[in-house]
Swiss-Prot record:
Subcellular location: Cell inner membrane
Pfam family, one: OSCP
Any one GO cellular component localisation term in the record: proton-transporting ATP synthase complex
Entry protein name: ATP synthase subunit delta
Protein family according to the UniProt entry: Belongs to the ATPase delta chain family.
Record's signal peptide: none
Origin superkingdom: Bacteria
HAMAP family: ATP_synth_delta_bact
Membrane topology note: Peripheral membrane protein
Species in which this protein is naturally found: Idiomarina loihiensis (strain ATCC BAA-735 / DSM 15497 / L2-TR)
Gene transcribed to yield this protein: atpH
Subunit description: F-type ATPases have 2 components, F(1) - the catalytic core - and F(0) - the membrane proton channel. F(1) has five subunits: alpha(3), beta(3), gamma(1), delta(1), epsilon(1). F(0) has three main subunits: a(1), b(2) and c(10-14). The alpha and beta chains form an alternating ring which encloses part of the gamma chain. F(1) is attached to F(0) by a central stalk formed by the gamma and epsilon chains, while a peripheral stalk is formed by the delta and b chains.
Amino acid sequence: MSELTTVARPYAKAAFDFALEQGALDKWAEMLSFAAAVAQDETIASFLSSSSTVGKTTEVFLGVCGDELDDNAKNFVKVLAENERLPVLPAVSELYQTLRAEHDKEVTVDVKSAVKLLKAQQTALIKALEKRLQRKIKLNCSVDKSIIGGLVIEAGDTVIDGTLRGKLDRLAYALQS
């Protein structure tokens, strides 16, 4: 995946910069997401890998996308096709979303708990995390039955282990040292 990321990064950055300049961040996010879904389709993916002519590849790909892409996005796809980079569109879309979240000062936080969190708990958690991380928070909550109690919060490289098991482990470590 790192090679795909390396190849996709300049394209994602170019698309993001253009969308920012045009004031069309949402529109480009939708178009890239759609084009990425098309590129991931098994039939299209096999066609992209077997097609030898750039013109035919571009024509078919844009034909499948139809009116979902505006002229600028179509030109973007043509550049990708000319450089034989259409298969990296999903990575371009993902990196674009990352750049957009960074620009919007937004972070997706994964929260694992033993039971489903109530709306009030989610709201309180969002407020506390926004204060601590100084960013807009988007929660992605999941239930993990192996957690006896408490929460595991993952935000990028930051992990906050507030589970009972984590607290017991820290207590045991403190007693041993």
